Each structure stands twice: as C-alpha cells, then as structure tokens.
Amino acid sequence: MVNRIISFIASILLSVATTAQTDCYYTKYFNDKALVEKAEKWKAETQAWGGVFTKAKPHASVNATDFYLQYQKNKEEWDKLFKWLQETDLLTVPKGKMKLEDTEITISVEDSRNEPLEKRKTESHHHNCDFMIVVKGIERFGHLDHFSCTTKGQWKPDVIRYDYDKSKTRFYDSTPNEFLIFFPDDWHIAKIANDTKDQEIRVIVAKVRYCP
C-alpha cells in the first residue's frame, strides 16, 4: 500500500514537472526526431564542425539542430570564424570591432563588466546569430521564455527588447572552455552579475548571418 502511494505521488510530481516544462518555450523546436538526434551527435563531435578549433565546446544550451542547419547552409563563414578563434590570442587581441576578412561576420572584442540583472537589457535578433565566448572571467546569461514575454518597441534595426518573467527565465554561467550561440529564437540577456566577487570579463562576440 505504501509503495502504491509513493508511486502515485511520484507520478503526480512527474506530471507537474512535465506540464511546467511544456508551459515554457526557450528555443526553436524541431519535430523531425531523426534530424534532432543527428544534430545532437554532430554537436558533440568537435571535428565535425570545429576543424582545428580546440579552445572551447558548445554550451549545453546551444540549440544543436539550429547550429547544425546553420553550419550546413553557411559552412565557409563558420569555418573561417573557428579558424580565426583558434589562431588568435583572444586574451591579447586589441578590443574593438572588426570585420572578419572575406566574410560578412563582425567580431567585437569587449573588456566589460557584469551588472545586476535589473540593469541588463533583453534582446533577440532576426538576421544574425550571436556567437559568444568569454575568454576571461565568468559571464552569466539569461534565456527567456517566449510565452511570458512581451515585446518593447520596434526592431532597431536587428534588435528587439522584451518585458519578461524572471521566474521563468533560465540562468547559466559561461566560462572560457565553452561558447554560446543565440539564434533568432533564443531571446536572451548577457553580462549578468554572477555569484563570484570578480565581475570583470573579456568576451568575444561574433555576428554571423542567419540563413533561413
């Protein structure tokens, strides 16, 4: 009898957890199961996408299927980005913006500081992916739930802001051994203060064209 009660309670808790997950939407959904499984395997195999790039791996939050499809559609530019990241001393390269040679990619090298959440702006992009790798320090990100967000203003020119529900936002910290990619369906907040004393960071941000 006790075991039945425990099993019943467990099933209720699982049902609640599943419902809570389906009540939120954080990244683009793909219903092709075979494609999703292929993309997850591909994402885990650095040589499949990174070539010579060995400095970092994709963060768990990176949408594997979006990454896989974008890489196939724009392989030459992604390869040039990873080559530049591997061959460049990311700690000493001068800060500022630059155009990656023979590409449409814009790279920003930023010496910056994390701030309290209430001071940070939300954003998403329509025409570009945000590739981000923190090379010094720890950067906290927020991943926004679409269902509880409302837009603020208009696109300017490829950025839009949101009002959001903090309780439904996913937060995670990024370190120099991993990178993040925010595709158009990944609404996000960057440079949020983490739980450490040191909020100084150096981050590389690359704007890569999103191919429909």
Regions found by a protein language model. Give the residues of each.
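Bacterial N-terminal signal peptides that target proteins for export
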Residues: 1-7
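Jelly-roll (double-stranded beta-helix
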Residues: 5, 19-130, 134, 138-212
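Bacterial N-terminal signal peptides
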Residues: 7-17
